[in-house]
């Protein structure tokens, strides 16, 4: 179909033909329940083609598709939704299912194109709420913005899965990807990133919360290379599994609110920045040594350095703000040497945070004698740290004593673990009562 209107339609093509294509400044309107699939290479299910012409240099192709569309492609280089029209627009309403099988076949893509009629820019794609995007081939991204001025918008509760190597959930090279609340991204292949910008001209904006799952060691959950990735709408819940990386002046800025969970590490290179804001019982489970530009921790939120791989994890924070946060460390007080570390270059004046410990020394009994284990360096000396009772899930609660270095003959910029008190909890009392009876 090249121009016109359809209702409740089935379209199948092969051998390089597109199922639905609007060329130049044509408009296509299709009702609910469309099923469109292609089998050949470079065959798109929905395609807004070159929109610049000598008679209408600014008009773009327009395609509007109703609810519940099922779009699929099987060949290489075949996208379910392809925008290549100057000032064009594609709207896919809610509940669409988009699937690609071939290599280099994206779910939703906006590409720049240059021809004798001029260059293409400013295309827009809107994907409705509750839609799903799945790609299986290598180099096949869920959503790919590669057109100057393009805006690819995802409504709430869109799901994206990619299986192939180097297949990113979101990739912004030129243009903007906007994602509504409840976005769910899962990437499985080697070298695949959940949300990725790889040029200064690209950006990704989370307009609400998101779930991003990437456990691959050579891929990142969130990766900003030159561009920007932001999620600062507030009151949003993020669940992120995988690492974050900012390189070449790229920036990641996330407000993680309302029981958000981040399981992974962070890394910076070449003036990259990562700013994390943990509020209202949010949780960062640090899986290896990490560095962030700024970290806000408040409202009972926790930064847990005590991962299963062992101790001596170091988290470096250029600017720490907030108050009432919790930092949990793996420690071995008896050794006075082994333990995780928090290094802060600047902290908020008058702030207070709490310290929990998972101490190896307690496995074999009590820690006796005068001990001190360096945990925290605050180069600004603005923040205070207080040990807090922690329910370890066993027979005892644990209270660590944390003291500033100048009370121990050390630097006032440093904080030390000096004592661990074991206190009977309800479980201990129940067992003792049982023996007494």
What are these regions (language model features)?
Residues 108-110, 282, 349, 437:
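Short low-polarity hydrophobic stretches
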Residues 201, 208, 213-218, 223-347, ...:
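Extracellular beta-solenoid/beta-roll
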Residues 1-5, 17-24, 44-55, 78-85, ...:
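Glycine-rich beta-solenoid repeat tracts in large extracellular/virion proteins
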């Amino acid at each position: 179909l090249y121009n016109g209107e359809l209702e409740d339609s089935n379209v199948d093509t092969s051998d390089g033909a597109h199922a639905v294509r609007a060329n130049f400044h044509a408009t296509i309107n299709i009702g609910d329940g469309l099923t469109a699939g292609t089998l050949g290479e470079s065959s798109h299910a929905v395609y807004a083609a070159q929109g610049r012409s000598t008679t209408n240099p600014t008009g773009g192709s327009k395609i509007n598709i109703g609810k519940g569309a099922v779009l699929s492609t099987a060949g290489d280089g075949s996208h379910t939704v392809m925008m290549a029209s100057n000032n064009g627009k594609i709207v896919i309403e809610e509940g669409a299912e988009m699937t690609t099988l071939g290599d280099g076949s994206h779910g939703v893509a906006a590409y720049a194109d240059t021809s004798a009629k001029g260059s293409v820019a400013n295309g827009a794609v809107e994907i409705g709420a509750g839609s799903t995007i799945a790609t299986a081939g290598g180099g096949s991204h869920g959503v790919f913005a590669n057109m100057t001025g393009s805006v690819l918008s995802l409504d709430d509760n869109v799901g994206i899965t990619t299986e192939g190597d180097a297949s990113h959930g979101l990739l912004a090279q030129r243009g903007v990807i906007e994602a509504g609340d409840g976005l769910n991204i899962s990437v499985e292949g080697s070298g695949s990133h959940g949300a990725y910008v790889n040029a200064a001209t690209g950006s990704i904006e989370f307009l609400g919360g998101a779930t991003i799952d990437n456990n691959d060691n050579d891929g990142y959950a969130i990766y900003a290379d030159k561009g920007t990735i932001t999620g600062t709408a507030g009151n949003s819940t993020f669940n992120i599994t995988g690492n974050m990386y900012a390189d070449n002046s790229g920036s990641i800025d996330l407000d993680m609110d309302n029981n958000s969970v981040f399981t992974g590490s962070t890394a910076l290179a070449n003036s990259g920045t990562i700013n994390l804001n943990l509020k209202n019982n949010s949780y960062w489970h640090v899986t290896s040594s990490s560095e962030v530009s700024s970290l806000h921790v408040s409202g009972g939120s926790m930064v847990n350095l005590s991962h299963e791989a062992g101790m001596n994890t170091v988290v470096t924070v250029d600017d720490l703000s907030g108050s009432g946060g919790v930092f949990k460390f793996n420690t071995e007080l008896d050794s006075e040497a082994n333990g995780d570390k928090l290094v802060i270059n600047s902290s908020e004046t008058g702030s207070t945070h709490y310290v929990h410990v998972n101490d190896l020394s307690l496995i074999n009994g009590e820690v006796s004698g005068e001990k001190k284990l360096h945990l925290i360096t605050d180069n600004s000396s603005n923040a205070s740290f207080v040990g807090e009772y922690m329910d370890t899930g066993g027979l005892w609660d644990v209270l660590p004593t944390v003291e500033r270095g100048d009370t121990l003959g050390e630097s006032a910029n440093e904080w030390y673990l000096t004592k661990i008190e074991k206190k009977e909890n309800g479980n201990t009392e129940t067992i003792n009562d049982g023996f007494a009876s």
